[in-house]
């Protein structure tokens, strides 16, 4: 499984490992900012895209809006799962409302069913 994460504060590999996720078979790439985010998504073609709501310089919510436009016009392939990750329930709700498949508090990321 190919996982692309945009998260600026916490190491996603560490969060998943602490959550008991078996990382074998997972190719995880984390970016600590959203610069060139669409090119990174296009090049990596993730199965799972993790988007932090408050990441700079472009917030994850704005990245999601732009990504969905590019998908709609056929300019980029849609990841199998787009998952909003934030420490704020309100931010996660906003990500789902905008078109993310699901969202989760980032510290509970290891509990999500995608890792089963």
Language-model regions, residue ranges each:
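A generic structural motif
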Residues: 21-29
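His-Asp phosphorelay/catalytic-motif detector in bacterial-type signaling
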Residues: 45-47, 72-81
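Conserved acidic segment of CheY-like receiver
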Residues: 1-12, 16-20
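Alpha4 helix (beta4-alpha4-beta5 surface) of REC/receiver domains from two-component response regulators
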Residues: 62, 84-108, 112
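Acidic, metal-coordinating helix/loop segments flanking the phosphotransfer/catalytic sites
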Residues: 30-48
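Short acidic, S/G/P-rich loop/turn micro-motifs used as interaction or catalytic elements
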Residues: 9-13, 54-59, 89-91
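Alpha-helical interaction/dimerization surfaces of two-component signaling modules
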Residues: 18-22, 40, 94, 98
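Conserved phosphotransfer microenvironments
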Residues: 47-71
């Amino acid at each position: 499984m190919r996982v692309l994460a945009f998260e600026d504060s916490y190491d996603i590999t560490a969060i998943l490992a602490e959550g008991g996720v078996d990382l074998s078979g997972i190719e995880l790439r984390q970016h600590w900012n959203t610069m060139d985010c669409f090119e990174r998504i296009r090049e990596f073609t993730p199965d799972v895209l993790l988007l932090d709501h408050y990441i700079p310089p472009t917030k994850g919510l704005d990245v999601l809006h732009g990504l969905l436009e590019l998908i709609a016009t056929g300019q980029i392939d849609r990841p199998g799962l787009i998952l909003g990750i934030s420490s704020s329930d309100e931010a996660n709700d906003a990500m789902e409302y905008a078109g993310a498949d699901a969202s989760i508090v980032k510290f509970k990321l290891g509990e999500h069913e995608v890792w089963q």
